[in-house]
Amino acid sequence: EVLSRTIKDGRVISLIHKYLNAGVIANGIFERTEIGMPQGGPLSPLLSNIMLNELDKELERRGHRFVRYADDCMIFCKSKKSTERTLKNIIPFIEGKLFLKVNRKKTTVAHVSKVKYLGYSFYRNKGKCRFRVHTKSVAKMKNKIRELTDRNNGMSNAKREEKYQQFVRGWVNYFKLADMKNLLKDTDEWARRRIRAVYWKQWKKIKTKYRMLKALGMDHWKAKELACSRKGCWRMAQVLNQIFSNKIIAKLGYIPMLDYYLVVCEN
């Protein structure tokens, strides 16, 4: 019914129905889709906007401030009481008029500082609402860096550098609205130490370590001392901080997150 009010071509509506009822293959097994649609499907965001356009109009008619991305929506009110009242009134509209089911587990009343939305969290500064990266998003980012800089993943240096650069560019561009200079500064220092540890393990033999340290500009006796050290990779990564400098790591292709963030913000 909602689709028919927006889309006048019956053939298109028929095609959409066929798509929704086509089923999915999960782990090699066909499963029927009787409710909803496959997550991540190319039609999902388009249908979300068609279906929820009615919700947008209703919220505007009621004078609410809100933000919506696909089916993820936040409605802003001045007090907890008015928020609870709005929630109580809007759910019947969504379920009764749009025939959509509201996920009660994900629907909540909370202060904006306690909310996670599209990976962001929010805080107030000088009377304005500011963005920061949510702690869960930070944890996911660090887990990805751990994966890319794992000393035992068997990845070639060229492939690791390429994947690391791709991840940094994508992640920073997504979260560029957030205030995160300090976060990225600390993350860069931690990531560079992990990268140094990767190279130290790759050098393996004492003579290889000595040769590489000399190539980095270390004098004979110091290079010999470090090459013979029995300290672990993580400890040695800290010792190598000055000789295996940040500039060298950047030249290898490991783009600093903070530097890229500042460039993105300027543009």
Named regions from a protein language model:
Residues E1-K114:
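Conserved polymerase palm-domain catalytic core
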Residues D9-I13, L87, V138, K142, ...:
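Alpha-helix initiation and N-capping motif
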Residues T33-P38, D150-R151, Y174:
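Short hinge/gating elements
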Residues N21, P92, K97-E162, Q166-R169:
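A conserved non-catalytic segment of reverse transcriptases
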Residues G63-Y69, M141-D150, K201-W203:
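Short, conserved aromatic-histidine micro-motifs
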Residues R160-I206, Y210-K214:
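Non-catalytic, peripheral interaction segments enriched in hydrophobic/basic residues
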Residues K8, L43, L47, S82, ...:
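Catalytic cores of large soluble enzymes that bind and process phosphate-bearing ligands
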Residues Y199, W203-N267:
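Extended C-terminal regions of large enzymes
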